[in-house]
């Protein structure tokens, strides 16, 4: 079964939920696992069925720089603990779209480049909207219950490191420096996340993405 067919299977499961409020879909996975690509493909597949879809990322809910780098710019623990503003993420995006929510939501709280808060004015969701959110630490225990369907993009650490280092070569000045950052900060933080929260275990679908052309899907019983 090819990639498009596997993603269609996941979309089928999501649309069977038939909720009375927007369906909040989470896409987690280690850094450079392919979360954003997967989330975009899933969004396109659901859009083609005529449903309104909104894409969002936890990376638009960063903490200010002073908080993000309080433990050091290369600190794995700092990245894991301090990168994102989970209060804004939950209160401004996830909860308004859940049961008894008012359907008024934001998809961004902080501008990463200017390092200033963002107040763009709230958006109004349709009850049949599907929200697809990607983020590395998305399925932490105090957040995951706010998603109606949870995906974990499962990619081998070495493969993800090579993909990520290639992607970030320009940002870090060389492939070698980018690879070091993945080893020492990003993926070290991901291992903390996996050890503490076991996100794969709580996922409804595990999307094995080490082989981009031939991914596999494992569906897990909802708990």
Specify the residue positions occupied by each region the protein language model found.
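NTP-dependent small-molecule kinase module
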Residues: 1-17, 166-170, 184-223
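P-loop (Walker A) phosphate-binding loop of NTP-binding proteins
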Residues: 30
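Conserved lysine of the Walker
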Residues: 35
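Hydrophobic positions on the alpha1 helix immediately C-terminal to the Walker A/P-loop
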Residues: 38
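Post-Walker A helix-loop "phosphate-sensing" segment adjacent to the P-loop in P-loop NTPases
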Residues: 44-54
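Conserved nucleotide-sensing/catalytic segment adjacent to the nucleotide-binding pocket
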Residues: 54, 63-113
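ATP-dependent NMP and nucleoside kinases share a basic, alpha-helical "lid"
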Residues: 116-170
């Amino acid at each position: 079964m090819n990639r498009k067919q596997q993603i269609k299977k996941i979309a089928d499961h999501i649309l069977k939920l038939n909720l009375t409020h927007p369906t909040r879909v989470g896409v987690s996975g280690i850094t450079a696992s392919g979360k954003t690509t997967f989330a975009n493909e899933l969004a396109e597949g659901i859009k083609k069925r005529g449903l309104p879809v909104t894409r969002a990322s936890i990376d638009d809910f960063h903490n200010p720089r002073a908080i993000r780098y309080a433990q050091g710019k290369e600190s794995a623990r700092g990245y894991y603990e301090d990168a994102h503003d989970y209060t804004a993420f939950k209160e401004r995006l996830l909860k308004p779209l859940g049961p008894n929510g008012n359907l008024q939501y934001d998809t961004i709280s902080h501008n990463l480049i200017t390092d200033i808060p963002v107040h763009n004015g709230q958006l109004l969701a349709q009850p049949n909207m599907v929200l697809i959110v990607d983020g590395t630490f998305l399925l932490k225990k105090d957040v995951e219950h706010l998603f109606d369907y949870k995906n974990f993009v499962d990619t081998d650490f070495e493969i993800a490191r090579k993909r990520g280092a290639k992607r970030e070569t320009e940002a870090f000045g060389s492939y070698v420096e980018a690879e070091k950052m993945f080893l020492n900060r990003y993926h070290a933080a991901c291992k903390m996340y996996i050890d503490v929260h076991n996100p794969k275990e709580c996922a409804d679908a595990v999307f094995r993405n080490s082989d981009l052309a031939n991914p596999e899907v494992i569906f897990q019983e909802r708990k």
